[in-house]
Amino acid sequence: MDAKFNVKTFQGMILALQDYWAQQGCTIVQPFDMEVGAGTSHPMTALRAIGPEPMAFAYVQPSRRPTDGRYGENPNRLQHYYQFQVVIKPSPDNIQELYLGSLKMLGFDPTQHDIRFVEDNWENPTLGAWGLGWEVWLNGMEVTQFTYFQQVGGLECKPVTGEVTYGLERLAMYIQGVDSVYDLVWSDGPLGKTTYGDVFHQNEVEQSTYNFEYADVDFLFECFNKYEQEAKFLLKQEPRMENDKEIWVETALPLPAYERILKAAHSFNLLDARKAISVTERQRYILRIRALTKGVAEAYYASREALGFPGCKK
C-alpha cells in the first residue's frame, strides 16, 4: 500500500493513482471542463486515440449521466460521478500487469483477493468507437473497464490504444468498507472528516430534480439543433448565414467542433431523462451525433497529418 497517501480516503486514493501512473510515464492532465458521460469523451482519449502519434495520459474525469440520478436516495446510483482514466498508445504489452500493480499499491494483493478479467467488449455509438475489452471484477464487484480501442469516429486505430477506466466510487467503497457512496470519507485532515455526502448529496437531489422534472424540453431540442449546426459549420460541412451572406471557415476546426458535439450529446441525454425522445427518435439522434463525430475524427486526423504527425518525431 502506498504510504505517501491515505488511500482510505477518496482524495488520497485519487492522489495515489495519479502518483502511480505518473511513475509509469503518464502525463497527468486535468479533467475536461465540459459535461461528458465518461472519461473516454475527454479529448485526450477520444481524439488522441486517432492517428499514429504515441501518447500516455492519466486523469480524473467527472462524468454525468442524467438518467442515472436517484434524488440522492440510492446508495450507489449517481447522475454525477468520477472515473480515473489511463490511456497509452501504443498499448504496452504489460498494461495488465501495470494495472494489477496499481491495485497492489492500493492494498489489494492479487494473491489474497479474487481479481478476474471478464470479457466485455466495449462500444460507444455516439463516438463511433468500439474496442476489445474486459470488465475487472474485484471480489465479485466490477471496479474497472479495460479496453483496446479498435475504432474511434469510424477510423481504425493504428496503433491500438490501451484504456483503463477505474470506477472511483466503487473502488473507494470497497477500500473503505461502506455500503453507501455518501458515507465515503472524502478527506480526513486537521479540520476533521469530510464525507462524499457532505460534498455532493445536495447536488444529487437538485440535479435529479432538474434532470427528470424541470429541464426545458423545447429549449433542449433547440440547443441540440444549434450545436449540430455549429459543429457542421466548424467542420466546413455547411456555411453560416451572417447579414444575408454565407460565411465559411477557412480551415476545419475539429477541436471546437468536438466541443459543440459534446454539448449536443448532453442536451440529448437530458432529453432522454425527460423521456422526450421516443425509441425510434433516439436512434436517429444517436446517428446524427455519430455522423458529426466521424467528421471530427476525419478532420482531426487530416490536421495532424498536415503537420506531419509531430508526436511521432519525439
UniProtKB/Swiss-Prot annotation:
One of its GO terms (molecular function) is ATP binding. The keyword Plastid does not apply. Keywords: Aminoacyl-tRNA synthetase, ATP-binding, Cytoplasm, Ligase, Nucleotide-binding, Protein biosynthesis. InterPro entries: aa-tRNA-synth_II/BPL/LPL, Gly-tRNA-synth_heterodimer, Gly-tRNA_ligase_asu. It is found in: Cytoplasm. The keyword Glycoprotein does not apply. GO terms for cellular component: cytosol. It holds the Pfam family tRNA-synt_2e. It catalyses: tRNA(Gly) + glycine + ATP = glycyl-tRNA(Gly) + AMP + diphosphate. Its EC number is 6.1.1.14. Tetramer of two alpha and two beta subunits. HAMAP family: Gly_tRNA_synth_alpha. Belongs to the class-II aminoacyl-tRNA synthetase family. This is Glycine--tRNA ligase alpha subunit. It comes from Actinobacillus succinogenes (strain ATCC 55618 / DSM 22257 / CCUG 43843 / 130Z). The lineage of its organism: Bacteria, Pseudomonadati, Pseudomonadota, Gammaproteobacteria, Pasteurellales. The gene is glyQ.
